[in-house]
Each structure stands twice: as C-alpha cells, then as structure tokens.
C-alpha cells in the first residue's frame, strides 16, 4: 500500500493516518520529520538542507525528493508507505513522478471550508496543562474557564478564524490542484498512475475510518 493522503488543515488527516498506518503496517512519511532526521544524521542531503535552512531559505524540491528516495530504501517501507503533507504543489508531484516514486492510491479527505473554520476556530486551550476544549463539541463547564483550575482558556493564534481562512486559501491554491493532477494522470490510462479516491471527512471518527478503508480496496 503506497499512498498519498490529501485534505485541508483540520480535516482529521492525522487521526486517519494513524488508523491507516496500523491497518496496513506502513510508516507515515512526513517531509518535516525526514528533514530533521537527515540534518541530525549529517547525511550529504541533510548537510545541504541545513545550509539552506540556516540561511533562512526554503529547501528545494530536488533536495526533498532526494530525501524521499533515501527514506523509501529503508526496510520499514517494504510493505509500502504513506505520504502526509507531501507533495504540496504540482512541481513536487511532477518531481515525484519523474523520480519514479510508486504510488497506488491518492486519498482525499473532503471537508467543507465552513466546517473547517468552525472546527478550528472553536478550539480553546489551557496553556499550562495542555488541556483542550471546543466551544461546541467539548465545552468547558464554565465558559472560557479550565475545568480543573478555573483559569482562563485562550484561543491559539493558529486557530483564529482569519489564520484558518488564510491556511485554507493556501490549500486551495497550491494543494487542491493535486487532486485534478492525479485524476488526469489516472484518466490517461497510464498503468503507473495511482487510483484517486475521495471520501467525506464529516461524521464520527470510526465512520470516516470505515470509508477510508473501503476506498483503499
């Protein structure tokens, strides 16, 4: 099972990724983790990436694809792998295709923007303990106060409505076109093209998991 997981921020990709990983016995490959590991290990690509990052630059797609290819050589990838948060852009998808990285499925978890905004902007946190609440789905006993200490809850900057909307704009501009990219490739009849599946990310977690497993048959 070689898979790319797509979906907007707040769609529940992380939760579903854990279930998919467990079911198929495959590692979740995050480019952020890969970069940190390569830098720490001091691999040639890691050294190159560190130079760019230390200078405040963005690591090139070429370096990222090199890291991906190295990572896929590791033993835990023999039964497959799952990409989460990569590729993010069409040039990255092209680079992966050119590098011959095999993909069986592209699974999109679809959630309307209005639902994402409600999910994320409703989050509240008690910073000292890390306890989290949601104004609609998991409200504190007293509005705006932590259940245990009675201290104030805060809305993290990441969860503010305008921030969430900006992140969604970036997703729609850069990452959502990947669905069309992979669908067109699949429609071309190329045997190497992945199967593209879309499921709804609305409902209970176990319902979404059942949809995901069903789509990956």
Swiss-Prot record:
Places the protein is found:
Cytoplasm
The answer, when asked if Membrane is one of the entry's keywords, is: no
**Record InterPro entries:** Adenyl_kin_sub, Adenylat/UMP-CMP_kin, Adenylat_kinase_CS, Adenylate_kinase_lid-dom, P-loop_NTPase
**Binding locations of AMP:** 31, 36, 57-59, 85-88, 92, 156, 167
Associated pathway: Purine metabolism; AMP biosynthesis via salvage pathway; AMP from ADP: step 1/1
Gene Ontology terms: biological process: AMP salvage
Gene3D superfamilies annotated for this entry?
A: P-loop containing nucleotide triphosphate hydrolases
Q: What is its EC number?
A: 2.7.4.3
What keywords are annotated for this sequence in UniProt?
A: ATP-binding, Cytoplasm, Kinase, Nucleotide biosynthesis, Nucleotide-binding, Transferase
Q: Give the principal location in a single coarse category.
A: cytoplasm
Catalytic reactions on record: AMP + ATP = 2 ADP
Q: Which GO terms describe its molecular function?
A: adenylate kinase activity; ATP binding
Which positions in this protein are listed as binding ATP?
10-15, 123, 132-133, 203
What are the start and end residues of every segment in region (LID)? Answer: 122-159
Which top EC class is given? transferase
Region: NMP; residue ranges are: 30-59
What's one GO-annotated cellular component? cytoplasm
How does this chain assemble?
Answer: Monomer.
Q: What is known of its domains?
A: Consists of three domains, a large central CORE domain and two small peripheral domains, NMPbind and LID, which undergo movements during catalysis. The LID domain closes over the site of phosphoryl transfer upon ATP binding. Assembling and dissambling the active center during each catalytic cycle provides an effective means to prevent ATP hydrolysis.
Biological role:
Catalyzes the reversible transfer of the terminal phosphate group between ATP and AMP. Plays an important role in cellular energy homeostasis and in adenine nucleotide metabolism.
What the record says about family reads: Belongs to the adenylate kinase family.
Protein name, entry field: Adenylate kinase
Q: Which gene encodes it?
A: adk
């Amino acid at each position: 099972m070689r898979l790319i997981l797509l979906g907007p921020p707040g769609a529940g990709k992380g939760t579903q990724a854990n279930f998919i990983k467990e079911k198929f016995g495959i590692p979740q490959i995050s480019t952020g983790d890969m970069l940190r590991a390569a830098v720490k290990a001091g691999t040639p690509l890691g050294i190159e990436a560190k130079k760019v990052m230390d200078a405040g630059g963005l690591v090139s797609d070429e370096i990222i694809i090199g890291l991906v290819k190295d990572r896929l050589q590791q033993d835990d990838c023999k039964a497959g792998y799952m990409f989460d948060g990569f590729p993010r852009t069409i040039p990255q998808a092209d680079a992966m295709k050119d590098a011959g990285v095999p993909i069986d499925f592209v699974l999109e978890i679809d959630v309307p923007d209005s639902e994402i905004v409600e999910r994320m902007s409703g989050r509240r946190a008690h910073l000292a303990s890390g306890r989290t609440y949601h104004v609609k789905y998991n409200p504190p006993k007293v509005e705006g106060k932590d259940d245990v200490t009675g201290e104030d809850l805060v809305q993290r900057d990441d969860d503010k409505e305008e921030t969430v909307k900006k992140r969604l704009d970036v997703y729609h501009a850069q990452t959502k076109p990947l669905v069309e990219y992979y669908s067109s490739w699949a429609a071309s009849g190329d045997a190497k093209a992945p199967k593209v599946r879309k499921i709804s990310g609305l409902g209970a977690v176990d319902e979404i998991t059942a949809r995901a497993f069903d789509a990956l048959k």
